[in-house]
Regions:
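The conserved Walker
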Residues: 9
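Hydrophobic positions on the alpha1 helix immediately C-terminal to the Walker A/P-loop
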Residues: 16
Length: 145
């Protein structure tokens, strides 16, 4: 099953998903996948959004995006704003994100790490016998929420 959660910037979508995943896990539901929280910093009072490439609105500047691999909780740096990656020297002009001309620098190794995580989940699901419950008391499901 696939759900899409949408909303404005900085309204708490990721925090809500993190709480939901923790609650489901606490109830014995296996939660697997990837959460993608932003990496933010508080703007200085004199900084204006849009000035010097300051991304995001309001009090916070978005610097990057991490991935949290569930169910284990491993946090993987995933994307860095391209202007920051260029300034820091971490931009790779041969990366997939550079080829796609994204506003984010995403290391090919980070993409491979997340893809390997999804491959592992798919393999674990394939090994679950048909009809095995995913949710407590639910028959006919496949082991994950």
């Amino acid at each position: 099953m696939l759900f899409l959660l949408t909303g404005d910037v900085q309204i708490g979508k990721t925090r809500w998903l993190e709480r939901l995943a923790a609650e489901l896990s606490g109830d014995g539901v296996q939660v697997a996948g990837v959460l993608a929280p932003g990496v933010w910093r508080v703007r200085e009072p004199h900084e204006v959004p849009g000035e010097r490439g300051l991304a995001g609105e309001g009090r916070f500047e978005k610097l990057g995006i991490d991935n949290v691999l569930l169910p284990g909780g491993e946090r993987v740096p995933f994307a860095r704003r391209r202007d920051l990656a260029l300034a820091e020297g971490s931009f790779d002009p041969t990366s997939q994100s550079a080829s796609a001309q994204l506003a984010w620098e995403i290391a090919d190794e980070a993409i491979a790490r997340v893809n390997a995580h999804f491959d592992r989940i798919a393999a674990e699901l394939a090994a679950v016998p048909a009809g095995a419950p995913a949710l407590p008391g639910e028959a006919g499901s496949r082991g994950y929420a």
